[in-house]
């Protein structure tokens, strides 16, 4: 097939997208496809008319514009097959507040999600924030707590705060970059990520990956710097817990309407899976989680990207 790989973008994850995109493009070439790398930069509007020439597009943009439903809406209007979830799913998954509400509602409706909980959370707006509200946040969420942007990826802008002073500093600093922040209960346990891919139209859960970062948590540096994280696959969980988490993740994936490939992150503590987020366009670098899980499942990187692009074309 004649394929285009959408990479780069205008978000703070641009460099990671380029790393992922170039690796994907080479893998697709290895599988016999003709591939162009399309940099989604400030001049992308002038490239739109050329997109129809491709049989399909592999979208590996991260963050704003690429992962939040905007690019998906553009590609839908053009009518070209693309990898990843559609507009509605992308909008919800990229918005951590909306996604928490969605998963909360899903937990209430399905018995197999009884293993899942969502850490307590608050949405804080820069317009409404006052220093005096720190005490209210501490009372409702407790310390330590996690501060993260409502809409962002790769743990950019994320802090773990152990005191009111750290919480105040984190909010003040991040409100320079974001209008809204989430303050969430900190759960200390096994940090895991569960990848799901579609195989012949059937969502399939890959082996659970346990993350043991050398830093306090799996932040941007730990994700993309070699040697900063120990990866355990399969995760060191008992069989019953593993089975329950797999069923729960599959239900979340299907209920949200995820397509082709996604990753669901969380913390396991005392047999409970504390949901953190859904990533509908997970990284595909040499250090990324989903390719590791696929490899443990017996799928090479070249086979993985070939499978994903072919799944995207199934909807024709």
Swiss-Prot record:
Mg(2+) 2 binds at residues 277, 279. Coiled coil: none annotated. Pathway: Cell wall biogenesis; peptidoglycan biosynthesis. Its EC number is 6.3.2.4. One of its GO terms (biological process) is peptidoglycan biosynthetic process. It holds the Pfam family Dala_Dala_lig_C. One of its GO terms (molecular function) is D-alanine-D-alanine ligase activity. Keywords: ATP-binding, Cell shape, Cell wall biogenesis/degradation, Cytoplasm, Ligase, Magnesium, Manganese, Metal-binding, Nucleotide-binding, Peptidoglycan synthesis. The keyword Manganese applies. Belongs to the D-alanine--D-alanine ligase family. This is D-alanine--D-alanine ligase. It comes from Fervidobacterium nodosum (strain ATCC 35602 / DSM 5306 / Rt17-B1). The gene is ddl.
